[in-house]
């Protein structure tokens, strides 16, 4: 006999109310400290949205970066927690506020994605910045 929790609760007069999960904004400080080609030591982890829809990432408060960010842009390497590349990555680089939209490609609620911020191999400086995820 298969017992269903939903049916058992209904039998007790409990009505299930399922709300769509939401994610609070998360601010993560990440730092790529050394020159050319450095990858941030601190990964930026974020759950995907419920359907795998893109999440907005804002890069703000750039400091100590290369004097020529147009020629030596930052890059973002997005991976699943298992290390596989995430699909659908579209990003804008430079200084100021930039955006990165990424789609899990899986659409599974609860998947984690890890972004590591990297400086360009031609850069002569590292970068310090704040990353804000907005689902």
Residue ranges and their predicted role:
Residues 68-72, 112, 121-135:
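Edge beta-strands of jelly-roll/beta-sandwich modules across compartments, strongly enriched
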Residues 42-45, 95-106:
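Exposed aromatic-hydrophobic patches
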Residues 67-84:
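Short, surface-exposed beta-strand/strand-loop-strand elements in extracellular ectodomains
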Residues 31-33, 81-99:
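Solvent-exposed serine/threonine-rich low-complexity stretches and specific carbohydrate-binding patches
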Residues 77-81, 118-120, 134:
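Predominantly extracellular/luminal cell-surface or secreted proteins
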Residues 59-66:
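Short amphipathic, basic-aromatic surface patches that mediate peripheral association
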């Amino acid at each position: 006999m298969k017992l269903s929790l939903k049916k058992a609760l209904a039998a007790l007069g409990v009505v299930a109310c399922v709300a769509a999960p939401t994610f609070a904004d998360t601010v993560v400080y990440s730092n790529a400290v050394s020159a050319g080609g450095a990858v941030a030591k601190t990964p930026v982890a974020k759950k995907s949205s419920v359907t795998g829809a893109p999440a907005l990432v804002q890069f703000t408060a750039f400091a100590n970066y290369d004097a020529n960010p147009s020629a030596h842009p930052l890059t973002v390497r997005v991976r699943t927690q298992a290390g596989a590349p995430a699909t659908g990555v579209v990003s804008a680089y430079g200084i100021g506020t930039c955006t990165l939209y990424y789609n899990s490609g899986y659409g599974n609620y609860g998947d984690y994605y890890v972004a590591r911020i990297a400086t360009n191999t031609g850069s002569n400086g590292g970068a310090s910045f704040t990353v804000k995820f907005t689902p």
